[in-house]
Amino acid sequence: MSKKALVIGVNGQDGCYLAKSLLEKGYRVFGGQRRNTPLKHWRLNEMGITDNIEFVDLDLIDQKSIQNAIEKTEPDEVYNLAAQFIGTLSYEKPKLAKFVDGLGVLRLLESIRQINPKIKFFQASTSDLFGRAKEVPQTESTPFHPRSPYAEAKLYAHHITINYREKYNMFACCGILFNHESPMRGERYVTRKITKGLALWLRGRKPIVLGNLETQKDWGHAEDFVEGMQLTLNADQPQEYILATGKTITVRQFVDKTLTYLSIPAYWKNDDCCDKRNNKLIVTTDKAYRRPVEAGQLVGDSTKAKTELGWDRKYDIDGLIADMVEADLRRYSKS
């Protein structure tokens, strides 16, 4: 009999890659989604797997809907990849971040404990937990210093997952995920702003407007990270693992690499990037796009995951950029 997995956040970047990977491994995959939220299946549609997902109503604010979803699907594994807000956006509705990203995980764990404590549970934690980290790179033992309501809520979720594991002997674990991108990344993230923006710029559209070009990120590929999630949940013992590349590049360097891939000769004049052939503006900046509270340098040490789980990455930064650029060129070739 096939294993069953409930993926909460199945319509997101990580959820679609995880669902695809699980389906390829023979799993029966259930996708948890809020009933009154407009369905956003574009990622699953683009991957061609929408019809293979069995959708169930699940709202992390509603304990009863969580219980109903778990009772209906009877999963062997539950992956919580849902998040209401990211980073500084959580300042707009801090209470909702708390109720969804923090207390929502408590509701999940309590439902699993009551219905079937043998269900394995994976919680997607975030490198934002480290905030202004006091050591670089960060390991599983680096102290946390969250810098936003989102990060505070995720820290509660991280700790309550460990608490339930220790108190009730549940197989519950967290993956501390550093930045990971893909063609399925949302358009408000800087990497997609760049790859989509350049695809449109090639079609005669406006220059790309960015924030701080010197911000450094540890960027990996979501496809690699969802494999790490599955390895974490299938380890001999439940533990926390960092998933990261261990390397950072700046936003400016990401732009440069993308331009190089597209064979666009360019030069920088301060924070403006122009086409060498005709001096046409490609990229500019606006202070309005700068984050009000920048975290410290976040770069993860995934030695533990590599050593204990055998986790390895298929994509380097150039492979990630190539994958994202080709996808956006296909999408916007007729724009």
Predicted regions, residues:
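C-terminal substrate-binding subdomain of Rossmann-fold SDR/epimerase-dehydratase oxidoreductases
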Residues: 24, 31-32, 58, 187, ...
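N-terminal Rossmann-like NAD(P)+-binding domain of SDR-like oxidoreductases, especially those catalyzing
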Residues: 1-180, 223, 233, 296, ...
